[in-house]
Amino acid sequence: MESKRILILRLSAAGDVIRTLPSIKFLKERRPSVSITWIVEEPSHALLKSQPEIDRVILFPRKRWAQGIKSLKGMWGTIGEMVKFVKDLRKQRFDIVLDFHGILKSGILSFFSGSPVRIGYERRSTKEGNYLFSNVKVKLPKERISRFQRNFLLLRGMGLEVRNPQYRLTIPPEDQRPIELFFNAFSPSANRPWIAIHPGTSSKAIFKRWMPDQYARLADRLVQELHATILFTRGEEELEGVEVIRKEMKEPSLLAPETRSLTQLGEVYRRCNLYIGGDTGPMHIASLMGTPVAVIYGPTDPVENEPFGKHIKIRKEVGCNPCRNRSCKELKCLKAIQGEDVFKATKEILGITI
């Protein structure tokens, strides 16, 4: 098995791709001579190309294909491109497929790869009939486990047991330099904790956002009582929401530089003493940089979405959570969390007693 070609299937989303990386690092450490190829969609393509344990990254252009197939003019060209994609995939002659995604499209890719060993999860742990495409099925425990643990357990299909895993996201030097310049400009003091706050989410995950006024009051208190430097981070669509919070604050805060990649964002978090935010991809990036995280959970599962490293969970049980109800208008689970709850959690994880 040492010289095998292995295909990894975890196509999206960014947070789930990130949570698969520790498993691949462990696999490479235990089987150092294997060649690892990963099929992934944007925006995770650049992130994976920067990670040394991955030998090749193949971009899966799902959105472009979905657009092309809509018109008669573009349909045949798109179908031809799909056929070529599959032919090129089969030419790689993969020995093993690890399907971490567990949905129909990853199952189809696994089958069309032509690999003789296709490792996936058993029926109850997959969706859309994915289990039909694997010939080695890994059974997961009935109790809830984190996504990190779920991914580690798939390696049992290769006879690997994961214990005490360690992981740090690799940041290329070209992504370290611009962030270093930003932090050097503010001469961070060893006596002032730098706290990164990421209040936003993607447009599809607004139901996970804590209240902006609560973030503003919390940030003020962190400055006033902990003498913290507050650094707000944001995604492409989140700047307006961050500015609303900053304008409502009475104390000064900083806006992190716009990051061009997930690894640049990781470098920002590496230089901070703490991350505060919701259950998002950036939270998992911070945890994989070794930065302690304080996570505000509303409608999502705090066990399944547990961070990798040192963390503290802030959550209120309101009877209906976790539910992942994207259309919920009440958001009782988030409104029940007060600034005092997050402030206490912050002091606890930082080891501060005042």
Locate each region found by the language model:
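Catalytic machinery of carbohydrate-active enzymes
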Residues: M1-I354
